[in-house]
Regions:
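Beta-strand elements of well-folded, non-transmembrane domains
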Residues: 17-19, 66-68, 79, 94, ...
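Beta-strand/loop substructures that line and gate deep hydrophobic ligand-binding cavities in soluble
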Residues: 87-138
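Hydrophobic/aromatic beta-strand elements that line small-molecule binding cavities or substrate pockets
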Residues: 13-15, 73-79, 90, 99-106
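Hydrophobic pocket/interface hotspot
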Residues: 24-28, 34, 60-62, 77, ...
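Glycine-rich portal/gate segments that line the openings of hydrophobic small-molecule binding cavities
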Residues: 45-92, 145-150
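Hydrophobic ligand-binding cavity/cleft-lining segments
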Residues: 1-51, 55
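A non-catalytic, amphipathic alpha-helix used as a structural packing/dimerization or gating element
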Residues: 138-146
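A short, structured loop/turn motif at beta-sheet edges
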Residues: 21-22, 53, 79-85, 103-112
């Protein structure tokens, strides 16, 4: 099961997985796994020396390519609640604001993995409608499919 909604500065994606939250969260707590969950068209590359496990206040530097333009991005882990949720916030990158909450909710089928993003862009509604929304749909659809492959 997969649900995706993107509307003017907010994105919501949920994926039902057959594994429980502790196993799924463990995968997410290794920043090297970001590469696995990121579509190749973004040309994602981690630039930071990473710890074994992500923790509160960690900063992760990486580079992506948006429309063939290389962009440096730095995220900071601002919430870390093991097996339940964490939040990464862009502190350097292409958005005016990017706050990405990852939730893991156990249920009778395993766990529901939820991505909630609140974002603001520099050039407003038209750029969001023409470019950002479509790219986020591609990114989160890829991510949901990859999570299903790994945990179903």
């Amino acid at each position: 099961m997969f649900e995706l909604k993107i509307d003017q500065g907010e994105s919501y994606c949920s994926t039902q997985l057959s594994k429980k939250s502790d196993e799924v969260f463990e995968f997410f707590s290794d920043a090297n796994n970001l590469q696995i969950l990121t579509p190749s068209f973004l040309k994602f590359k981690i630039l930071s020396n990473l710890p074994d496990k992500i923790k509160l206040n960690d900063k992760i530097d990486y580079r992506i390519s948006l429309r063939h333009i290389p962009i440096k991005w730095r995220s900071k882990i601002t919430v870390w609640d093991p097996n339940k949720r964490f939040v990464d916030e862009q502190i350097l990158g292409p958005y005016r604001q990017w706050v990405h909450e990852h939730l893991f909710i156990d249920n009778e089928h395993g766990c529901l993995a939820i991505d909630k993003v609140k974002y603001k862009i520099w050039f407003g509604f038209i750029v969001d409608k023409l470019f950002v929304k479509k790219e986020l749909e591609r990114i989160f659809s890829f991510r949901a499919n990859k999570l299903s492959e790994l945990f179903n």
